């Protein structure tokens, strides 16, 4: 709530995906976080951190048979759980959201429907993101910040989830 860029991004996600888990604040509202107990956290870890939801990667010099044996024994010792639940793809909702706050800068975030995870077009989206606003050599940064001096910071982002994607342009400017 005290970081303008975070506040803008949470407001954008809430407006773009109303009623969807993707539209909820990452950390949750203070009331939910304050109500959590250690038992809640332990239950969450038991339910979510299971072999069915795990990705294991090995890179480097290793004996495949020995590693597989270690992994199979180690994973067999972990409690089982349900696989990842199916989630309906949320509908993207265009909106205008204003959140007045006493900050030294105005944090703007524009968002468009992006490319979901698993879509072949995601690679083109990643490249477009890099060119448009992916760093200090991007078109947005060079033109709007360096040449015109219109923004303190400016960048783009591409976020992909199952069935949904979001492309954003974020900027911090003078009021």
What residues fall within each predicted segment?
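Charge-rich, well-structured scaffold segments of protease-associated domains
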Residues: 1-83, 98, 116, 124, ...
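M16/MPP (pitrilysin/insulinase) zinc-metallopeptidase core fold and M16-derived inactive scaffolds
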Residues: 131-149, 161
């Amino acid at each position: 709530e005290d970081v303008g860029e975070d506040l803008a991004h949470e407001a954008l996600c809430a407006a773009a995906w109303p009623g969807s888990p993707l539209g909820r604040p990452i950390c949750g509202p203070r009331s939910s976080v304050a109500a959590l107990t250690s038992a809640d956290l332990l239950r969450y870890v038991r339910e979510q951190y299971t072999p069915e939801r795990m990705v294991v990667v090995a890179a480097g010099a290793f004996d495949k048979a020995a590693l597989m044996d270690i992994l199979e024994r180690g994973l067999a010792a972990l409690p089982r759980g349900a696989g990842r639940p199916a989630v309906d793809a949320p509908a993207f909702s265009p909106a205008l959201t204003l959140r007045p706050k006493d900050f030294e800068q105005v944090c703007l975030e524009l968002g468009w429907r992006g490319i979901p995870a698993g879509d072949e077009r995601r690679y083109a989206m990643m490249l477009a993101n890099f060119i448009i606003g992916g760093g200090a050599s991007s078109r947005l940064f060079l033109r709007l910040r360096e040449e015109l001096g219109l923004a303190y910071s400016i960048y783009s982002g591409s976020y992909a989830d199952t069935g949904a994607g979001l492309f954003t342009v974020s900027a911090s400017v003078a009021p």
